[in-house]
Amino acid sequence: MITEAVFSAGATGIIAHAFPGPESLRSIREVDLSKEMYVVITMSHPKGGDHFKIEEFCSLALEVGATGVVAPATRPEDVARVKSLIGDLEIISPGVGAQGGDSKETIRAGADFIIVGRGIYQADNPASAAEKYMSEMDIND
């Protein structure tokens, strides 16, 4: 199974889509309960949430014992909705930077972490770009 290979290679966690259903997620989770597993609730790209069943997928993440979920920084309203459904599970949110998600708004909506890719690795100065995103996450400003 892919999950076993990923963990054997040293990964400490895995991200899995919810749409294959509970059996698939359980089989991933049971490979190594000490590893983190995040369940994709909805996607960050335009129209990325159109075919996702947010309530059902959040319930599934709770049922299988996920560490957390993936919800889009491009739609903070979805992050807030997901947060209300998952309780203490973590939310990681892609879509900050190149896709237009706002880190501060996403954290305020309930995300625990943001995911930034191109906004850092395509920057002229990736270290400065990373620092900029870090400073934006202080919601006390």
Task: Give the positions of each predicted feature.
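A general structural detector for well-ordered alpha-helical segments in enzyme core domains, enriched
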Residues: 2, 24, 28, 57-60, ...
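A C-terminal functional module that forms or caps the active site or interfaces directly
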Residues: 73-120
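Short, acidic/turn-prone active-site loops that include or flank metal/cofactor-
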Residues: 18-20, 42-46, 95-99, 118-122
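Conserved anion-binding
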Residues: 1-76, 88
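C-terminal helical cap(s) of enzyme catalytic domains, especially alpha/beta-barrels
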Residues: 28-31, 104-141
